[in-house]
Regions:
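N-terminal positively charged helical leader segments and presequences
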Residues: 1-102
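Glycine-biased, small-residue-rich flexible motifs in mid-sequence functional cores and linkers
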Residues: 2-12, 76-396
Length: 396
């Protein structure tokens, strides 16, 4: 069997990963390739493995051809301090995002990549909120920070901006998921906030540096936002809103969805009311959010502690792997709580050492799909369950 031990030259490995990102097309075959060969240089050089993993002829042609000019800008961007590239094969890839549907092949991060492991709530809503909606976004963000959670949002105008700004003002941790490259501030009015988050938080994008705003990128931005968070809180939203897309994606990932009720006369309350009718939790204060998320947050804190103990290469700068900070795990521990052991035992009994799909686990355990998905996430973070392409086994 060929030796695919990762090469010692991180710059060449990063270039190979950049080429894999830039070749475009469906991400799933490229993820399979990195699962099969976790060294990007060896992966893209193995034509047979590329074909076996499902890469298209167009993708193969892009990998074999000359490196596009866009990669030069990306390589230059990665040379700056606190600029990182985290691939699917990387142990620093965010564990919650890994468990979401259709995760991205790689993430560009400006700022602190350890924040992608920190328990977070996505706070989303209208780009043109009411004054009350803006105030609620800021108040909930401050309270979530006080409970030890990070606040994630999309750096859009309105609710996103209010949540990010209030988090920074409270001395908390915030993650901004972008629909552009990590170096592009959009909207332009948020250039200062973009710079502040790069310094005190984390900017995250699946797009190459230099990529400008494109309409088709923002739904995928919402997918990542829903995927890195323990749950999604919708402050204000019209019936047709990007915030509702984020909420739907969160539910599909087995995450909690929360919504604030509002006046029946406020058009921006209708989206929240629709979510509540569809099963989202109605919340009136941040404590209700933290109580609902406490079990999974504690499991994520355990994953943080294990990651702290793991050996790493590099110092976290210039694209090298980054160790999560000890205070992240300490803050996450504040969210610990007990869980319903009877339901977990039912799911554990339904699991075996042969890979089992979600539908069969729901049938065996007689729990709901949402319950099983959430419990599997927690058990996987604890190291009790292993996931194999949508099927699950006991790991011990």
């Amino acid at each position: 069997m060929p030796d695919h031990t990762p090469d010692a030259d991180p710059a060449e490995a990063r270039l190979a990963l950049l080429r894999l990102v830039a070749c475009g097309g469906p991400a799933a075959p490229r993820r399979r390739l990195l699962e099969h060969i976790p060294d990007p240089r060896a992966a893209i050089a193995d034509a047979a493995a590329c074909r076996d993993c499902g890469l298209s002829s167009a993708q193969l042609g892009a990998l074999r051809g000359p490196a596009p000019d866009t990669l030069r800008h990306a390589r230059d961007w990665l040379q700056a301090p606190r600029h990182h590239l985290i691939g699917w094969h990387d142990p620093d890839y965010p564990p919650l995002l890994r468990r979401s549907p259709a995760p991205p092949l790689a993430l560009f991060v400006a700022g602190d990549p350890a924040l992608l492991w920190h328990p977070a709530v996505a706070v989303v809503g209208s780009r043109a909120p009411t004054p009350g909606g803006r105030d609620n976004a800021a108040a909930f963000a401050r309270a979530l920070v006080g409970s030890g959670l990070a606040v994630a949002s999309g750096l859009a105008a309105g609710i996103d901006t209010a949540a990010h700004a209030a988090t920074l003002a409270a001395g908390g941790h915030t993650v901004a998921v972008l629909g552009t490259g990590p170096d592009i501030a959009y909207p332009r009015g948020n250039r200062e906030l973009h710079a502040r988050i790069a310094t005190a938080g984390a900017l995250v994008s699946e797009h190459l540096p230099g990529t400008g705003p494109r309409k088709e990128h923002f739904p995928s931005r919402n997918r990542i936002l829903a995927g890195i968070a323990l749950g999604t809180l919708v402050i204000e939203a019209a019936e047709r809103s990007g915030a509702l897309i984020t909420a739907r994606l969160a539910a599909e990932s087995g995450r909690e969805v929360f919504a604030l009720p509002g006046s029946i006369h406020n058009p921006l309350a209708r989206g929240c009311h629709r979510l509540i009718r569809d099963g989202a939790a109605l919340v009136e204060n941040a404590q209700q959010v933290t109580e609902a998320l406490a079990p999974v947050a504690e499991a994520l804190a355990g994953a943080l502690r294990r990651r702290l103990a793991a050996p790493i290469a590099g110092d976290g700068e210039h694209g090298a792997p980054a160790r999560v900070a000890p205070e992240r795990a300490a803050q996450a521990q504040r969210l610990g709580a007990t869980r319903d052991d009877a339901d977990y035992q039912r799911l554990w009994n339904a699991l075996g050492f042969d890979p089992t799909g979600m539908d069969e686990l729901v049938q065996r355990s007689r729990l709901t799909t949402a319950q099983v998905s959430s419990m599997l996430l927690l058990m996987e973070l604890e190291g009790r369950v292993a996931a194999h392409h949508g099927r699950y086994t006991r790991s011990r």
